[in-house]
Structure formats: structure tokens, C-alpha cells
Amino acid sequence: AEGWKGCYALGSSYIALPWWAGMATFGQLTPDVMVLTVLYSIAGLGIAIVNDFKSIEGDRALGLQSLPVAFGVEKAKWITVGTIDATQLFVAFYLRGIGEDFYSNVLFCLIAPQIFAQFKFFLPDPIKNDVKYQAAAQPFLVFGLLATGLAWGHHVNMLAA
């Protein structure tokens, strides 16, 4: 994806739009849900950047300004992990703030192996290890999305009771 907009568009199409459609159909699409999913879409932006590392030569040849081309590999790899980690940490603290401590703790536990995989695979060589990193880390991010959805469902049910 080219630049910030392309990566964010990709991340939001995978995360925010399906969640919003589901909430609009089966629940209630509230500002809180929109904020949580926009945050996870920023994590999705980071995931989209991971895919750009393997295309650096082609992007340069075609004049595409993917983040690794625009910022260089060193800066782009830190932008990548920063967006993925910071947004999930913010969501975990948000869940704690609304009283969903159990789910917040679950999310913290799911973030830890992602950070481990970042230091083991991605940060040393994002071009060579992108697939290893995604295989090791992505399932934990997806389970984090699930935990956040369950937390929100629990929170809404507790408010309704």
C-alpha cells in the first residue's frame, strides 16, 4: 500500500468496516465502538506496512512511496511495531478504564508474545523475517480483537442489567 493513507485504508477495511457493519446489523454502533475499531485499524496499518518490506525494490522502481521506501527500512520497522503495540496498549488501558479488568489483562497477555516476536524476527531483519513474524504474532493480535469484542459485549450487557 502506498504511504499512510493506503496502509490505513487497508487496515480499516480489514478491521473497522466489518466490525461497524456487524454492530450496525446486530448491535448498536456507538462512538466507543468506533474509537476502538479505529484504534485497531491503526494496528492494521502497522500490519499492512509489514507487507511493504518485501516490495521495496519494486516500489522504488515504480515510484511508489510505501513507508519503507519513504522512511527507509530502519525507521519504517519502528513505525510498524509502534503502531501495532501502542494502539493495542491503548485499547487495553481503555478496557481497564471502563472496568473490564479481566479482558484488559487478557489483552496485555496477548500483546506480550507479539512484542517478543517483533524482537526475535521482525526488528532484526524485517525483509527476511516478515512471514515468520506474521506467523508468530498475527494470531495474538486477532485473539486480541476477539477479547476486545467480548469485553465490549460484556460491558454493554452489564450496563443493561
Provide a role label for each language-model segment.
Residues 1-161:
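Multi-pass alpha-helical membrane architecture of UbiA-family
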